[in-house]
Structure formats: structure tokens, C-alpha cells
């Protein structure tokens, strides 16, 4: 599963630029143009890092940052404040409100990308790791290779993403709709039964030579990967 970055920026051209550069660095990006919309979206799906503009319609970035820090589920969310306010007093205010870093516009795109990676290394090193392990299964994000008990498992691209998603939270039960969002994305319409087809293919690939089945079906709930 790709590291998720949420960008809350009301300048559409800048939002597009940030999405392009972040996706080129291997991140999954969700762009939001309004502060009030961001507050709702962040409750529905929590990113690994938030890039937040100060001046936003609906709810200001500084107010949104304050609210996020008051909630248990977002109190540790890495936040980079992105703003044209470069005065020392404003930087101090942004950091005191809860931002972890403060970048003043105009900014260097390569420097911002470096700051994003540095913050993720500190706050969530697991999301940048190329190697995932769960039980006797090993998945390498960089080489797109999977091994079980040292034997290579051949997977198609969808089955690879599905396994990666399940391995990101071993033991957690994901509904079909959650798997669709996490593996196929929000903007692609796929019937929920498609999930069953790909889970079946993944099972078949992993369970060679009478290997124990590590994918658990929870009736009426979804699927999980046994750890």
C-alpha cells in the first residue's frame, strides 16, 4: 500500500502541481480544496501525512490544525503547514498550534518532497519501508516480488496490491468496500464481487503445496490476513 498524503490547498494550480510531484515520488495523494471538506474527509480516511495551507475557505488551516490536535485519532498526524505567511510570529503560531513543519510560499518543490520524506521517516518509518513481512510471507514493494517460505509466489498486479493492503494491517478485517477503496481507489467503479474473484486468485497463489490458508473469510464482514 502506497504511503498516503492529503493535500489541503485552495489554489487549484498549486494543488495539481503538488499531486503530480508527490505521485512521482511514489505517494498516493488526496487533494482537497476547502478546510471544512478536509475536516470531513480526514475523519473518513486518515492519511499518513497532511500538507495544509493556512488560508482556506470554510475552515482556516490554522483552525483545522488546532481541531486535529484535539482528537485522539489525529493528535499524532504529521502536519506540514504550507503558507505565504512568512513572518516569525506567524511561523511560531503555526508550530505552536500543532504543525510539525512550516514551509513558506514560494517554496522549492524538491525541498518540500525531501521534508515530506524526512517527516515520514521520523513519524512513520514503516510506511517508507520497501519490505513487508507477515508470518512466512515476505513482500518487497520495490521489486514487486513475493516469497512464502523462501519460495517465490507469482502474482498479478491487482493481487500484489491486494496482498500489500492486507499485509499493512495483519489481523484486521476489511470489508469489500474498504478493499475496493484501498486497492482500486475511490474514483474507479468496480463491483464488490470483483474483490471475491481476486481474493480467490490470491489464495490459490499463496496456498501452493497444501500451505495453510492465511486469508480468513469473515462471513458478513470481509477478509483479513492471519498473522
From Swiss-Prot:
UniProt PTM comment: Phosphorylated by PhoR.
One of the GO BP terms on file: phosphate ion transport
Chain ranges of the Response regulatory domain: 4-120
Signal peptide limits: none
Stored PANTHER family: PHOSPHATE REGULON TRANSCRIPTIONAL REGULATORY PROTEIN PHOB (PTHR48111:SF40), REGULATOR OF RPOS (PTHR48111)
Residues with 4-aspartylphosphate modification: 53
Locations listed in the record: Cytoplasm
One example GO MF annotation: transcription cis-regulatory region binding
Protein's UniProt name: Phosphate regulon transcriptional regulatory protein PhoB
PROSITE patterns in the cross-refs: OMPR_PHOB, RESPONSE_REGULATORY
Role summary: This protein is a positive regulator for the phosphate regulon. Transcription of this operon is positively regulated by PhoB and PhoR when phosphate is limited.
CDD domains in the cross-refs: trans_reg_C
Cystine crosslinks: none
Pfam families in UniProt: Response_reg, Trans_reg_C
InterPro entries assigned to the protein according to its UniProt record, in alphabetical order: CheY-like_superfamily, OmpR/PhoB-type_DNA-bd, Sig_transdc_resp-reg_C-effctor, Sig_transdc_resp-reg_PhoB, Sig_transdc_resp-reg_receiver, WalR-like, WH-like_DNA-bd_sf
Keywords: Activator, Cytoplasm, DNA-binding, Phosphate transport, Phosphoprotein, Transcription, Transcription regulation, Transport, Two-component regulatory system
This protein's GO CC annotations: cytosol; protein-DNA complex
DNA-binding segment(s): 129-227
Major location (coarse): cytoplasm
Domain of life: Bacteria
Amino acid at each position: 500500500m502506497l504511503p498516503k498524503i492529503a493535500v489541503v490547498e485552495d489554489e487549484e494550480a498549486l494543488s495539481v502541481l503538488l499531486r503530480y510531484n508527490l505521485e512521482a515520488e511514489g505517494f498516493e495523494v488526496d487533494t482537497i480544496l476547502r478546510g471544512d471538506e478536509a475536516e470531513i474527509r480526514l475523519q473518513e480516511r486518515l492519511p499518513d501525512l497532511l500538507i495544509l495551507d493556512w488560508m482556506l475557505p470554510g475552515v482556516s488551516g490554522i483552525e483545522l490544525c488546532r481541531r486535529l490536535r484535539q482528537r485522539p485519532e489525529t493528535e499524532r498526524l504529521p502536519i506540514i503547514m504550507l503558507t505565504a505567511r512568512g513572518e516569525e510570529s506567524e511561523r511560531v503560531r503555526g508550530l505552536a498550534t500543532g504543525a510539525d513543519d512550516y514551509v513558506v510560499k514560494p517554496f522549492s518543490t524538491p525541498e518540500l518532497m525531501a521534508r515530506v520524506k524526512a517527516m515520514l521517516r521520523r513519524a512513520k518509518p514503516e510506511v517508507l519501508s520497501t519490505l513487508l513481512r507477515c508470518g512466512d510471507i515476505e513482500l518487497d514493494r520495490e521489486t514487486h516480488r513475493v516469497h512464502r517460505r523462501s519460495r517465490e509466489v507469482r502474482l498479478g498486479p491487482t493481487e500484489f496490491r491486494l496482498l500489500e493492503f492486507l499485509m499493512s494491517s495483519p489481523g484486521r478485517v476489511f470489508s469489500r468496500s474498504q478493499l475496493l477503496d484501498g486497492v482500486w481507489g475511490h474514483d474507479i467503479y468496480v463491483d464488490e464481487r470483483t474483490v471475491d474473484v481476486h481474493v480467490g486468485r490470491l489464495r490459490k497463489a499463496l496456498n501452493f503445496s497444501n500451505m495453510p490458508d492465511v486469508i480468513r473469510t469473515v462471513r458478513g464482514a470481509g477478509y483479513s490476513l492471519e498473522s
